[in-house]
Amino acid sequence: MATIFSRIVAGEIPCYKVAEDDKFFAFLDINPMVKGHTLVIPKQEVDYIFDLSDNDLAAMQVFAKKVALAIGKAFPCKKVGQAVLGLEVPHAHIHLIPMQSEADMLFSNPKLKLSPDEFTEIASKISAAM
C-alpha cells in the first residue's frame, strides 16, 4: 500500500506542488504552521529519513536548500527552519518553515486555515522564486 505522499507524487492525490526533480518532490503542507510551510520528500518510499543512502540523504538536503532559498525570497523571514519528525506519515520528509521567531516552529501551534486560492498563490510565489 503506497503512502499518501507516494500517491501525491503519482498524481493520485492533488497537492500544491512547489518543485520536483527526478528524485525529490516539494509541496505545500495542507496544515501549515505559517504561509510557505513546505514539505520535501524523496520519491523513493522510505519511512525513516536516516534509512536513505548517504548520497540520497545529501541530495535531499541540497534539493531542500534550493526550495528553502526560494521560500525565503517568496516569504521574507529571518530564516527558513527545517524540521524532521517523521511520526505522522510513514514516508521520510523535511518540513521547511519560514520563521520570524523560534515560536513559528512549534508544531503544537494552531495551524492556518487557507483557501485553495491562497495555497495556489503561495505555491506559485515559491515556484517563481526557484
List where the protein language model places each region.
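HIT superfamily nucleotide-processing domains
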Residues: 1-130
